[in-house]
Amino acid sequence: MIKSFNEIIMKVKSKEMKKVAVAVAQDEPVLEAVRDAKKNGIADAILVGDHDEIVSIALKIGMDVNDFEIVNEPNVKKAALKAVELVSTGKADMVMKGLVNTATFLRSVLNKEVGLRTGKTMSHVAVFETEKFDRLLFLTDVAFNTYPELKEKIDIVNNSVKVAHAIGIENPKVAPICAVEVINPKMPSTLDAAMLSKMSDRGQIKGCVVDGPLALDIALSEEAAHHKGVTGEVAGKADIFLMPNIETGNVMYKTLTYTTDSKNGGILVGTSAPVVLTSRADSHETKMNSIALAALVAGNK
């Protein structure tokens, strides 16, 4: 089973190279990531944006623009829409946000004519490689859905399972994270967790095992699960951590990022093609890992 981003990248390189359309590509950190992604055999790219600005940045960072197709579109909104259209028409396999605000970019992703909407809930999946655990940790949703209800959580679980399957985890273990591991009518997230677990038992959620509610320590650690007397397929062995809300997810994401020696990458899924939506605060390595993750999911339709 794949346990690291190096292994993810090796798996991506063993397949046909995918192509990412970069929306408003005149962004130095994004161009550096795209340059190195192609150099390392992870993904090719189509750069959509202001041609002259792209070339100027490319010269600054030692990037040979002749290695990439550039679509000149100085208008930010039109460039974002064009990048998405390249994916929906099959000329690229995934789309990546460049120097454009998130709201404008997502409006293009959800455009009724050329967008990537599927009718399902879009969600963000962050994948972490840590020294402490012998498996990859999938966090969802840490960036997109604020207070998902049961219907959205079903889609969020299915989206994350799709990513896990692409990586090679055949039957991922999903833990709906709550403050406690018992059902409490005053804590709605525990009720959702119980319903998701029963749906998994009945085969309504497929390709994974869902068991909850589970507190974070019990989902992560077999030792903690043993001490608290919690048993089951997921306790202490969870792959996917379903967050009850965006605050919990965002705090956990940033805690792992800034206080542990970890690596991560993340993508938006629930769309007809993967969406790379990184933050300017994300490291170069995180951007590269996110492109690799998107390429792997794009190749596993």
Curated annotation (Swiss-Prot):
Keyword field contains Magnesium: no
EC number(s) stated in the UniProt entry for this protein: 2.3.1.19
Transmembrane segments: none
Swiss-Prot/TrEMBL catalytic activity: butanoyl-CoA + phosphate = butanoyl phosphate + CoA
GO molecular function: phosphate butyryltransferase activity
Pfam name, any one: PTA_PTB
Pathway: Lipid metabolism; butanoate metabolism
Gene Ontology biological-process entries: butyrate metabolic process
Protein keywords: Acyltransferase, Transferase
Similarity field: Belongs to the phosphate acetyltransferase and butyryltransferase family.
The protein's role, per its UniProt record: Catalyzes the conversion of butyryl-CoA through butyryl phosphate to butyrate.
The protein, known as: Phosphate butyryltransferase
